[in-house]
Amino acid sequence: MATVENFNELPAHVWPRNAVRQEDGVVTVAGVPLPDLAEEYGTPLFVVDEDDFRSRCRDMATAFGGPGNVHYASKAFLTKTIARWVDEEGLALDIASINELGIALAAGFPASRITAHGNNKGVEFLRALVQNGVGHVVLDSAQELELLDYVAAGEGKIQDVLIRVKPGIEAHTHEFIATSHEDQKFGFSLASGSAFEAAKAANNAENLNLVGLHCHVGSQVFDAEGFKLAAERVLGLYSQIHSELGVALPELDLGGGYGIAYTAAEEPLNVAEVASDLLTAVGKMAAELGIDAPTVLVEPGRAIAGPSTVTIYEVGTTKDVHVDDDKTRRYIAVDGGMSDNIRPALYGSEYDARVVSRFAEGDPVSTRIVGSHCESGDILINDEIYPSDITSGDFLALAATGAYCYAMSSRYNAFTRPAVVSVRAGSSRLMLRRETLDDILSLEA
């Protein structure tokens, strides 16, 4: 049952590790009061706990046998600052566009520790990857395989590659972010034999060096068995490649997808336990197949960036809406919405929100938190119990917004993208400035 105390708690498995509510009710992250940040930088505002982000990088590195085995999935959230943090923690980086590559290189990230993804890379992207000495390219189609071989030959280089495999696992996740079943755009089918044919073609290509296979069962996955089943199926292909082609592939990239908690009712996947079980299982399976166990690589993005960040909004209007004869819902409008967080509208995602400028002490009421866009689906929190005293001028924060929020943001209704700041040891630093109308108008021809 919702209580006044619940409204003011900050669930540790949802909020940044350095988030604290003070005796006066104000929430701080890394010692910095969130209302002060809102006043200084404006709202909406993304606030990244740098030490939280870095500590999750280290947790992943420890779990999977070293930082070089962990590739931060930059699609979750990437800036030059983020790329530098990832570099300083020793992790590798995976990118999925030519501009993500550009951001990483602009930050000074070593190209040799970059892995490139994408189902439709094209000549320009492939050439940039080869010219800059990117460590791995994950091949997604036969056409791309031939094109990369051609591009690498033109540059006089041998490019290390992995083959993306669809092992046919139906991950327990949203349809749009499940990536390992058959009827979707990514990779080569294991069941049809096209994955083996791709591996054979890559092995025979003069300017490609096949170093491993890649698979990704989906995002926001909480069933660890899916990872082990995918590994088992893909290792069967390793055995086939070894026996028929005489090649021992040294790497197995199992992607990311480790689920995090967005609400107090959810529990994040225990990555340390999953990693231990997965690495043990891979070693055992490889031994049973009579092959050397490949080095396991992983690609967490959300599990690192997501919990490290909150988004601060200022509350605007509130209204009570009669839902039926015996129910009223409180609508709370904030100064952002689907332009800075499309996930609730796109995936039906849920979030945890708290007043961060004071203690909330009102009675529990059914509440819907909405944005300011001209769209009825502009909803951040659909139907939860919140205090009745949330009012105009309050600062409200959503937790776990570090992944796929700014990265998927838009200028819908000509809203400008929010600023992003990092906090550490009682101080803040601007990572990305807030966009302005001049930024929008600058694109006009």
Curated annotation (Swiss-Prot):
Pyridoxal 5'-phosphate binds at residues 257, 299-302, 404. Keywords: Amino-acid biosynthesis, Decarboxylase, Lyase, Lysine biosynthesis, Pyridoxal phosphate. Transmembrane segments: none annotated. It catalyses: meso-2,6-diaminopimelate + H(+) = L-lysine + CO2. Induction: Up-regulated by arginine and repressed by lysine. Pfam families: Orn_Arg_deC_N, Orn_DAP_Arg_deC. InterPro entries: Ala_racemase/Decarboxylase_C, DAP_deCOOHase_LysA, De-COase2_C, De-COase2_CS, De-COase2_N, De-COase2_pyr-phos_BS, Orn/DAP/Arg_de-COase, PLP-binding_barrel. One of its GO terms (biological process) is lysine biosynthetic process via diaminopimelate. This is Diaminopimelate decarboxylase. It comes from Corynebacterium glutamicum (strain ATCC 13032 / DSM 20300 / JCM 1318 / BCRC 11384 / CCUG 27702 / LMG 3730 / NBRC 12168 / NCIMB 10025 / NRRL B-2784 / 534). The lineage of its organism: Bacteria, Bacillati, Actinomycetota, Actinomycetes, Mycobacteriales. The gene is lysA.
